[in-house]
Design a protein with these regions (language model features):
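Structured alpha/beta or helical-core interaction and ligand-binding surfaces enriched in interleaved
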Residues: 1-149
Length: 149
């Protein structure tokens, strides 16, 4: 498959649209992971990835290429190092501001997990995946208020 390059920081390759900040070398293979959002609107996904990069939220972001994968849904991944607390806060704030964290019928945020790339490489998906970092470590799931500043 051919690689497609768009603009200065977007690459279309192998079923993904990658959005790069120019600082992706900061990501450490052993510490890197992602917060995820599942979508069904390709245009929205690409715009939100570009917005995340433009606003300095993460170093790298990607979304599924639904045309290539031929799936009705896709995933957005916001990449950062797992030990970078300030970057977790930036990504979580961005996700909350852009309504990318689902809520229960009672209005409580779902306790999403951060997924390390090592877990992805090990094939941890679905019931086999256990998040080591969870949203509840950063915010009160009922109110959305930060647990610590």
């Amino acid at each position: 498959m051919l690689n497609y390059y768009f603009g200065g920081n977007m690459i279309r390759d192998l079923g993904w649209f990658w959005f790069l900040s120019g600082k992706e070398d900061i990501l450490d293979e052993e510490k890197c992971g992602k917060w995820m959002y599942f979508f069904d609107d390709q245009e929205f996904a690409q715009k939100i990835c570009q917005k995340a990069i433009d606003e300095g939220v993460c170093y790298e972001c990607k979304c599924s290429d639904m045309e290539i994968t031929r799936q009705p849904t896709g995933v957005i991944c916001f990449y950062l190092n797992g030990d970078d607390i300030e970057n977790h806060k930036r990504v979580i704030q961005f996700m909350m501001k852009n309504d990318l964290i689902r809520k229960t019928k009672a209005g409580k945020y779902y306790n999403n997990s951060f997924k390390f790339d090592n877990q992805t490489r090990a094939g941890e998906y679905g019931a086999d995946f256990e998040g080591k970092i969870k949203l509840e470590q950063f915010i009160d799931l009922r109110t959305g208020e930060w647990i610590y500043e």
